[in-house]
């Protein structure tokens, strides 16, 4: 059995590529890296990689992580500017005994020394988004922070090896240097090949308060199906944050166990995810949730899929 699951519709092309690789007995590590890179390289996905939305100083700062479920080794980078594929940099850090999590200039120096591709990641399209949002904030006192759609994945190969990886440009209009949950082991991602893995998307500052990805893996280790584990972890922590703070940020989690069974839970409307297994072609699901945290899925319609791409590739006009 093999399988791969990812946050958001934007992962579909990458998941399709990984599905083909896994069918050909390629590793979970190589398959998930290629899947994440496909998202990083597509400029119309504005929360990851090339074309990612900038911080408040109009700089694109990228975060990424990679974890091996066999060894529990991980590599992470944060606040990286002008490198094409931060997930590949993160993967390369995984095998060191120390210095596995590098940020800012330190991460960039490491990437340069090790020959990773430099690339100007701020696109003209992202500049238009920035200028339009700046004007909206000035005119209407809108909250600047929005757009925190991390691509996160969990992968299982034919040999039972599991991996997890994430990549994001973080909150739109974030303070320079801000890091969310995406590169933080246990919060944005976690995987154990003896159990399974999970990955998060949403408001990182809140996801980190509960180490929600690790919590889902812990619940699976206790015997819960991935769907039960996701629903319990997300709903319980959503309630806990509201009890303590009166509010909870966006949280959506995906998971897969070492049998290829999968699950998803969210506290928002409009969440989508993609899954492929040995017995299921790459499929986009839309998620609905009730007040008790129970989630139901429906396959995205052709109309929904067409509208998704049309919206993201539509021409932009500077206001």
Predicted regions and their residues:
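Alpha/propeptide regions of enzymes that mature by internal proteolysis
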Residues: 1-319
């Amino acid at each position: 059995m093999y399988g791969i699951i990812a946050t958001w519709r934007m992962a579909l092309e990458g998941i399709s590529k990984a599905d083909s690789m896994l069918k050909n007995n390629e590793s979970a590590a190589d398959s998930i890296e290629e899947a994440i890179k496909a998202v990083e390289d597509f400029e119309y996905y504005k929360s990851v990689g090339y074309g990612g939305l900038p911080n408040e100083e109009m700089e694109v700062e990228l975060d990424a992580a990679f974890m091996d479920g066999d060894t529990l080794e991980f590599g992470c980078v944060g606040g990286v500017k002008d490198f094409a594929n931060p997930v590949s940099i993160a993967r390369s850090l995984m095998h060191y005994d120390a210095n596995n999590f590098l940020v800012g200039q330190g991460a960039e120096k490491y990437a340069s020394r090790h020959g990773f591709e430099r690339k100007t990641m701020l696109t003209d399209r992202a500049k238009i988004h920035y200028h339009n949002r700046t004007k909206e904030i000035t005119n209407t006192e809108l909250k600047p922070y929005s757009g925190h759609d991390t691509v996160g994945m969990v992968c299982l190969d034919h040999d039972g090896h599991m991996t997890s990886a994430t990549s994001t440009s973080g909150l739109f209009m974030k303070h320079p240097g801000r890091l969310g949950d995406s590169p933080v082991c246990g919060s944005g991602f976690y995987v154990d090949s003896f159990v399974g893995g999970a990955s998060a998307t949403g408001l990182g500052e809140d996801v980190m308060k509960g180490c929600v990805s690790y919590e889902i893996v812990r619940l699976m280790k206790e015997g819960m199906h991935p769907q039960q584990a996701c629903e319990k972890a997300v709903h319980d922590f959503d309630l806990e944050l509201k009890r303590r703070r009166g509010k909870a940020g966006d949280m959506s989690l995906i998971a897969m166990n070492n049998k290829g069974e999968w699950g998803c839970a969210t506290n928002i409307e409009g969440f989508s995810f993609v899954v492929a297994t040995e017995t299921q072609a790459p499929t986009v699901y839309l998620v609905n949730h009730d007040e008790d945290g129970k989630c139901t899925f429906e396959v995205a319609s052709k109309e929904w899929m067409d509208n998704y791409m049309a919206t993201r590739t539509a021409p932009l006009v500077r206001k």
